[in-house]
A protein has these predicted regions:
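A structured beta-alpha segment of the ubiquitous adenosine-cofactor-binding alpha/beta core
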Residues: 52-83, 87-100, 104, 143
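Glycine-rich, N-terminal phosphate-binding loop of Rossmann-like dinucleotide-binding domains
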Residues: 87, 115-116
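A short helix->loop->beta-strand "cap" motif at the edges of active sites that frequently abuts
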Residues: 107-110, 138
Length: 158
């Protein structure tokens, strides 16, 4: 399940599909066509609100939308093995997308990779610059320097 379909999110979709995964994705902006074109299923929140801001970036959502969004994501988290979050709002804290209740609903052995940890994280339980496993067996990765940790591999791929 990919949350945030900007550059990093679309790359995560492409890599996940290449590895044979069934991919679901969401973004506050209307990018369903891009998500479908990459072979992923679009997850929609049953609430109408335009989340596009200036320059094609996301803007902050209303409280009512956030509530509907978090319930949609909680239900999705029950069914997936990995959640990759990439949602950010320039100059602001990363939006909270995955609540602790959603993490409690996930299967043991599931993983959350919070690429928005540098801005506080999209997951309520993310610990900045840490990896840990919750009581129910979900591993949460909150590194803020993930690309630097993979420098040798990234250089070899280049």
């Amino acid at each position: 399940f990919i949350l945030g379909c900007g550059v990093a999110g679309l790359a995560a979709i492409g890599t996940s599909k290449a590895l044979g995964s069934v991919v679901r994705a969401w973004d506050v902006r209307d990018v369903a066509d891009q998500v479908h074109s990459m072979g992923a299923k679009w997850v929609s929140v049953d609430f109408k609100e335009d989340g596009a801001g200036e320059g094609g970036y996301a803007r902050e959502s209303s409280d009512a939308f956030k509530k509907a969004q978090q319930e949609t994501f909680r239900k999705a988290c029950e069914e997936v093995d990995i959640v990759i979050t990439t949602a950010a709002i320039p100059g602001k804290r990363s939006p909270l997308l995955i609540t602790k209740e959603a993490v409690k609903c996930m299967k043991a052995g599931s993983v959350i990779v919070d690429l928005a940890a540098v801005g506080g994280g999209n997951c309520e339980l993310t610990k900045k610059d840490e990896v840990y496993t919750t009581e129910n067996g979900v591993t949460i990765i909150g590194y803020t320097d993930l690309s630097a940790r993979m420098a040798n591999q990234a250089s070899a791929m280049y």
